[in-house]
Amino acid sequence: MVNLNDAYEIARYIKEVKKKTPVKVYVNTNSLHFQSTDKFKVFGSNGSYIFVGDYEDIMEVLDKHGNDITDTHVEYDRRNSAIPLKNTLSEHARIEPGAIIRDMVTIEKNAVVMMGAVINIGAVIGEGSMVDMNAVIGARGTLGKNVHLGAGAVVAGVLEPPSATPVIVEDDVLIGANAVILEGVRIGKGAVVAAGAVVTTDVEAGAVVAGSPAKVIKMKDEKTADKTKLMEDLRNLD
């Protein structure tokens, strides 16, 4: 198991793990019969089959029978991929189509991941937190509870350039659209990061920051809290 606390260990894992190109291959044949093996699955009968597995394993078999195959069609969405996508079927969270979530990501109860979001290896999405459309959480980036990561916002990861400390976003933080949180930054509980801000240093709890580089413009008050409150109906699956 890879040590997610070390950027170099993650990079080494990506380098050394067997790369895969998962595919679905549709095959028509007039004379052959195919069955599943320990390398791939086969569905179908009577000359029409669907293979599911790694491209190299499947083609090794099909190439041997090329003269007896009348037609093929290959569907794929990656090539030589090091890290598979996370199996999210058991997650008690709302995950919308088009989100890309890699393996070894933690998704806590009632989290929301919207269309087009990208979540890298080792990231953590806390309970009730929302990752909005096209937002990015880099490797080991961590959101606490009830965080809103705005559309197009970026939480930098620990890979390239390597960083010993991941971005930590504490509970009840709102990060506006297209904001960028750079490597190693910690955003304190209840803080607000304005849209488009570039955060290069830690933000204290309850602060409101804006600009590039982001600066504290005020402390969170009742008016700001009302403008940035979350909607529970978007999160609760019970």
Swiss-Prot record:
- Disulfide bond sites: none
Q: What class of enzyme is it?
A: transferase
Q: Give the pathway.
A: Amino-acid biosynthesis; L-lysine biosynthesis via DAP pathway; LL-2,6-diaminopimelate from (S)-tetrahydrodipicolinate (acetylase route): step 1/3
Keywords attached to this Swiss-Prot or TrEMBL record, sorted alphabetically, are: Acyltransferase, Amino-acid biosynthesis, Diaminopimelate biosynthesis, Lysine biosynthesis, Repeat, Transferase
Q: Name one GO biological process term.
A: lysine biosynthetic process via diaminopimelate
Query: Record's HAMAP family?
Result: DapH (MF_01691)
**Protein name per UniProt:** 2,3,4,5-tetrahydropyridine-2,6-dicarboxylate N-acetyltransferase
